[in-house]
């Protein structure tokens, strides 16, 4: 029996997503709202100041809500360091009720190694007594050196091996370690023409690492390419344009191979791209798939309020009528506008009626192990036969 977590919480609570858009450099496959920042600058200070103001703004409308989860993503949140990340969390604690927080999550890169270890230790020291779960997700992405190079990553296989081995002493009882991988679809060929993934030693290390069950969970994604991505702007580079990143079939074959290794090691597939040991699944990510309430804070962050939490006062302040069943909305994607405290994108409000809501609930349910348990509520949407 797979329990989703051991922490009681209300589905009426709010989850908070905080977007940190700064990166050491932009990865070639990345479609997220982020940009390279060579070193810490006034932009980070200005951004944190604006983020604090946005926190205060939402607390005026949702002060009665308890906060269920807090999730830092980007970008590369570890560029801020432990002190600035803690500063943002302290601001959240001042303006929201975080006393029943179920999960505090951070997305980090696995480099620079010593800096990451220091940040993890400092965040654990600051918050391990406050919150029942601190989740760190590390973007490993691949164990293939050529893929890592072409993708614009700043580490290679042996560096990742060292990172994972040296990370082990930092594990605590209330710490969850998640590791992200992407199926890029690059297969090598042996002299006999047989395809193989990565190198034999890299694939064996992955298998041994998974079987050790040091990792609490894995996220396994497939490469997706969009018109605005850096890779699309490098069509003149033959290596990137087709030599390694090939067909959807090859991408799926890599995904399938890695997926089977995870399943054989008793990681439970609780969502299409996510696998975990018992009670170690991401509490925050389930809020998306189960259409619970969340606010996105920061540049280009998305929010959703469902029909259980339609705050008419909040909608009045936006100058829009209260939606029938829910509302999706986004922040501006202009860093200048955001730092000038113009947070919301006025063109990105998507009200949901009852039919819209049911359609989203149905298809999001298909993504998870919970499925669509009450099929009868969707009969009005289903086509006969």
Each PLM stretch: what is its role?
Residues 24, 143, 225, 276, ...:
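Short, solvent-exposed loop/turn segments at secondary-structure junctions
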Residues 286-290, 296-385:
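Hydrophobic, secondary-structure "cap" segments at the distal end of domains
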Residues 34-61, 67-260:
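Conserved non-cysteine loop/helix-boundary elements of the Radical SAM core domain that shape
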Residues 21-34:
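Local cysteine-cluster metal-coordination motifs and their immediate loop/turn environment
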Residues 12-16:
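Extreme N-terminal starter segment of soluble prokaryotic enzymes
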Residues 233-314:
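A C-terminal junction/extension of Radical SAM enzymes
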């Amino acid at each position: 029996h797979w329990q989703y977590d051991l922490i009681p919480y209300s589905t009426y609570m709010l989850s908070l997503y905080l977007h940190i858009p700064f990166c050491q450099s932009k990865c070639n496959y990345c479609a997220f709202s982020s940009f390279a920042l060579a070193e810490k600058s006034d932009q980070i200070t200005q951004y944190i100041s604006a983020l604090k103001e946005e926190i205060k703004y939402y607390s005026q409308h949702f002060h009665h809500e308890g906060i269920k989860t807090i999730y830092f993503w980007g970008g590369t949140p570890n560029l801020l360091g432990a002190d600035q990340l803690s500063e943002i969390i302290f601001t959240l604690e001042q303006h929201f009720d975080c006393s029943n927080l179920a999960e505090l999550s951070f997305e980090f890169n696995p480099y620079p190694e010593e800096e990451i270890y220091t940040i993890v230790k400092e965040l654990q020291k600051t918050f391990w007594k406050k919150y029942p779960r601190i989740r760190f997700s590390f973007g490993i992405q691949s164990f293939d050196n050529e893929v890592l190079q072409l993708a614009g990553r700043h580490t290679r296989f042996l560096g990742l091996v060292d990172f994972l081995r040296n990370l082990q002493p930092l594990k605590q009882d209330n710490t969850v370690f998640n590791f992200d991988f992407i199926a890029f679809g690059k297969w090598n060929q042996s002299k006999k023409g047989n395809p193989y993934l990565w190198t034999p030693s890299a694939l064996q290390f992955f298998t041994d690492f998974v079987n050790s069950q040091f990792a609490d969970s894995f996220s396994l994604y497939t490469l997706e390419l969009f018109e605005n991505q850096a890779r699309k702007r490098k069509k003149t580079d033959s290596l990137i344009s087709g030599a390694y990143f090939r067909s959807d079939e090859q991408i799926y074959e890599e995904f399938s191979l890695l997926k089977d290794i995870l399943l054989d090691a008793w990681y439970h597939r609780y969502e299409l791209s996510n696998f975990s040991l018992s009670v170690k699944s991401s509490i925050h990510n389930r809020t998306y798939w189960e259409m619970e309430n969340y606010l996105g804070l920061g540049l280009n962050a998305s929010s959703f309020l469902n029909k259980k939490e339609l705050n008419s006062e909040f909608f009045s302040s936006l100058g829009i009528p209260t939606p029938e069943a829910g509302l999706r909305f986004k922040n501006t994607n202009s860093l200048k506008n955001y730092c000038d405290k113009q947070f919301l994108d006025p063109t990105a409000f998507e009200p949901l009626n009852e039919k819209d809501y049911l359609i989203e609930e149905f298809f999001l349910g298909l993504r998870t192990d919970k499925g669509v348990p009450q099929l009868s509520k969707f009969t009005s949407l289903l086509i006969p036969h």
